[in-house]
């Protein structure tokens, strides 16, 4: 249950759960920063341990029924997420924000296989969904002109998802983090040499090797971390 008291100047997160029909309630705010107003709490329809939380500053996820929360806003601006809903057929998480439109997290089903213990592993390769083989159709806009709108389709082929514990952190990301910790806001100029090195820096890559049942390599994918 998510509650708020912001109309009285109280922005603390109030989040509770019960496992005995409301006889006893437990606060489940571990991992949430202070003054994080909570708006909506939803539970996965297959794994009851998986919870999603909409807050004034983005989305959080819990893998253990709220005992610990993790910020879950990669690719999502730090915005007020006022409501959430789960599209059960596709396992999509749909977000409604305050003034910043709607967002959809496509197929979060891989999160069901994660636990707090598994996050300590060096890496995890998730079971992929069944991939469909088809001929993509190149369509047109008919006579509707600019009023016709369709969003971009997912890329053709199987989607392979993996988790790496210690992801690569670029020099620019490290610098921005250091600058964000400066209390007085007086950020020194890093120097042209440092900025040039940031631009020329290459990122680490993950190499995924795909083999058939006989152990023969059939494909190799390279993705930046």
Language model features with spans:
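Beta-propeller blade termini and top-face loops
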Residues: 1-148, 155-156, 165-167
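Short, glycine-anchored, charge-dense loop/turn motifs used at functional sites
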Residues: 65, 212-216
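Contiguous beta-strand segments within globular domains
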Residues: 135-205
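Beta-strand signatures of extracellular beta-sandwich domains
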Residues: 207-211
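Glycine-centered tight-turn motifs at strand-turn-strand junctions
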Residues: 217-225
